[in-house]
Amino acid sequence: MHKDDILKELKAIVPEEIIKIDEPLKKYTYTQTGGKADYYLSPTHNEHVQAIVHYAYTHDIPVTYLGNGSNIIIREGGIRGIVISLLSLDYIDVSDDAIISGSGAAIIDVSRAARDHGLTGLEFACGIPGSIGGAVFMNAGAYGGEVKDCIDYALCVNNKGELITLTNKELELDYRNSIVQKEHLVVLEAAFTLAPGDQQEIQASMDDLTERRESKQPLEYPSCGSVFQRPPGHFAGKLIQDAHLQGHRIGGVEVSTKHAGFMVNVDKGTATDYEDLIHYVQKIVQEKFDVELHPEVRIIGEHPLNEQ
């Protein structure tokens, strides 16, 4: 289909103001990298997401979902087809010991809402820079806690635009993985069941975790967060440190000297710089320790034309 025809048909199913054409994506990612999206849509209702996904399915148009871009690298060639930003689905509702949140809400804000209502169980998320949708997608966790510990259910959409409600068990939450990834679903909403707690104790725990995070992580630079999954029996950051790779730089991206598990954009780095550095670190760690590192960060999009 011609680009103008797709635009016309999209305008017929969702409000025109949520549609952008050839939208630069670098401003939506923590790494500050990325090319353009053919169509960038920011739905404000679940029904919008369903309509867009169903349209894309019936017209064989690829769909990519974005949260707040904290654990993703988008290549400079951009993303073909439709990109759906879920950030406008950011509601947070608290009732008794339960919180229901839209996919686009920051998990940090959900953690704070729990604290404000004297609910414990989400303290671990007080420093995770991701959206609820992304947190469920990868079973986000930190400091001994993870989404799996407290999520009740997630409302999802499949690739046909159909609604599916999945319980904690049905989500198949594992280390940085879930059925959402495996079946290419998208999370619209998640519900968490928490426990009553002492608000001062909850705040003290969050303060402690925040202090630990700020002292160890290179928050002063753009980054994609933790780059690699934890290999069985090892810590990725320790392996990278022992391989003397801290400070190693490709283009404008380097392995953080503050925390070896992070790669930071120190000087106008590109997605290609990130990808090349990831591959280099994997190669060296494999050679030195015979351990294979698997990226935790998602790398998506097209390579720029000059690299094809």
Curated annotation (Swiss-Prot):
PROSITE patterns: FAD_PCMH. GO terms for molecular function: FAD binding; UDP-N-acetylmuramate dehydrogenase activity. It holds the Pfam family FAD_binding_4. The keyword Cell inner membrane does not apply. It comes from Staphylococcus saprophyticus subsp. saprophyticus (strain ATCC 15305 / DSM 20229 / NCIMB 8711 / NCTC 7292 / S-41). Its EC number is 1.3.1.98. It catalyses: UDP-N-acetyl-alpha-D-muramate + NADP(+) = UDP-N-acetyl-3-O-(1-carboxyvinyl)-alpha-D-glucosamine + NADPH + H(+). This is UDP-N-acetylenolpyruvoylglucosamine reductase.
